[in-house]
Curated annotation (Swiss-Prot):
Changing residue 242 to T: In AN1; the mutant homeodomain binds DNA as well as the wild-type homeodomain; the mutant does not modify the DNA-binding properties of the paired domain; the steady-state levels of the full-length mutant protein are higher than those of the wild-type one; a responsive promoter is activated to a higher extent by the mutant protein than by the wild-type protein; the presence of the mutation reduces sensitivity to trypsin digestion. This is Paired box protein Pax-6. The keyword Magnesium does not apply. InterPro entries: HD, Homeobox_CS, Homeodomain-like_sf, PAIRED_DNA-bd_dom, Paired_dom, PAX_fam, WH-like_DNA-bd_sf. It is found in: Nucleus. Changing residue 118 to R: In a family with nystagmus associated with a variant form of aniridia. Residues 345-422 are annotated as: Required for suppression of NFATC1-mediated transcription. Changing residue 128 to C: In FVH1; isolated. Changing residue 125 to C: In FVH1; isolated. Residues 162-201, 269-311 are annotated as: Disordered. Changing residue 53 to D: In ASGD5; also found in patients with congenital cataract and foveal hypoplasia. It comes from the Eukaryota.
Amino acid sequence: MQNSHSGVNQLGGVFVNGRPLPDSTRQKIVELAHSGARPCDISRILQVSNGCVSKILGRYYETGSIRPRAIGGSKPRVATPEVVSKIAQYKRECPSIFAWEIRDRLLSEGVCTNDNIPSVSSINRVLRNLASEKQQMGADGMYDKLRMLNGQTGSWGTRPGWYPGTSVPGQPTQDGCQQQEGGGENTNSISSNGEDSDEAQMRLQLKRKLQRNRTSFTQEQIEALEKEFERTHYPDVFARERLAAKIDLPEARIQVWFSNRRAKWRREEKLRNQRRQASNTPSHIPISSSFSTSVYQPIPQPTTPVSSFTSGSMLGRTDTALTNTYSALPPMPSFTMANNLPMQPPVPSQTSSYSCMLPTSPSVNGRSYDTYTPPHMQTHMNSQPMGTSGTTSTGLISPGVSVPVQVPGSEPDMSQYWPRLQ
C-alpha cells in the first residue's frame, strides 16, 4: 500500500499530492522566468500547473527564495509595531506611495530583511487598517496617535501638521516623493554593498519588468496595427511575429492590442446598429396606417339613396333571421326581375335548405315592403301603392349592394327569390 497518492495534472505532468515540487523543477521555473518566458509558457514547457508556477515565482520575487514554506503551523507575524509605524510614516510623507514602493524602502533602510519582509498584500492590509482606524477615531485622537508614531512633539492640530517642515499644504506631496526618490538612490547604494547585491538587483529588475506600465504606442505603430486590423481581426502567430519585427513591439503586446481592438470594434458596431435601427424607425405612426385595407374592405359607393341603408337594423327591421341572411350572402350585381318571367313554384328541397333563413311567422307573405323604405322617402312611396304591378321595390342582398326588384302586385311571395340566388 502506497503512503502517498501520485497523479497526472491537466498538462500531463506527474505530481505527488500534498508534497511540494522538487527543487530542480523550481530552479528551472526561475531560470525560464529570467530568460523572459511568460508564466503560461513555463507552465506548458515544464508541465506544471499555472497556479503552481505563479505561486513559486511570486514567492521568489518577494523573498528571493525558491524553497517551499513549512507545511503546517502558523507563519510568524511580520507586521510588527515597528514595521507598522514605518509604513504609516512613509504614507504620511508621500500619500500616493504604492505598497511595493513601501516594501522596497523597508528593505533599503534595513527595517526588514528578506526573511521577515511583509508581502505587498500585508502592507496593503496595514494601510487599510490605518485608514479604518482613522475613520473610527476622532480628529484629536487621530492626531495624537500619528504624533506618537512619528515621534515628534510638534502641533498636529492642523492639517499642514501632517507634513512636517512644510508650510504650503500643496507642497508636502512633492517633497515626500522627492525624499522617497532619494531613498531609492540609497536603495541602490545599500544593496550594492550587501553580499547578495547582484541577486537582489536582478530580482528587482525582473520584478519591475513584470510590473509594467501601460504600453505607449507611437503613431507609426498605431498606423501599422490599424492597417493589419483592417486586413483581418484575428491575425495568426506568423502575422503577429512579422508585425512585431516590423514595428519593434513584443508579440504578446500585439496580441493584447488586437484583443482590445476587437472589443472596441464590437462596441462601435453595436452603436452603429442602434443608430441604423433608430433612423429606419419613423418618429410617429401615421393615422391612416393604423387601418389596414386588408382588414377593412372598402364599401362601394351607393348608386341610389335607398342603398345607403345596408342592414335591417338601420331600417328599423327587427327580424334577425333576414338580417343574418342578407349579411351572409355574397355580393351580387344589380339585376331586375321582369313581370314576364315565369313564376316557378319553389322546389321543396330548395325551400327546406333555406328554411332556417325565413321567419317562422306566416304573415311574411302579407307584409308590405314599406318597412324598408327610409324616412325621407315615405311620402313618395305612399303616393304609389304597392298593389300595382309596376311598383318597384329595392331588396338588399349584402352591405353596400342594392338590387332593384320588380315585385308582382298580386302576391309578394318571398319564396320566388331563392331559386334565382343559387
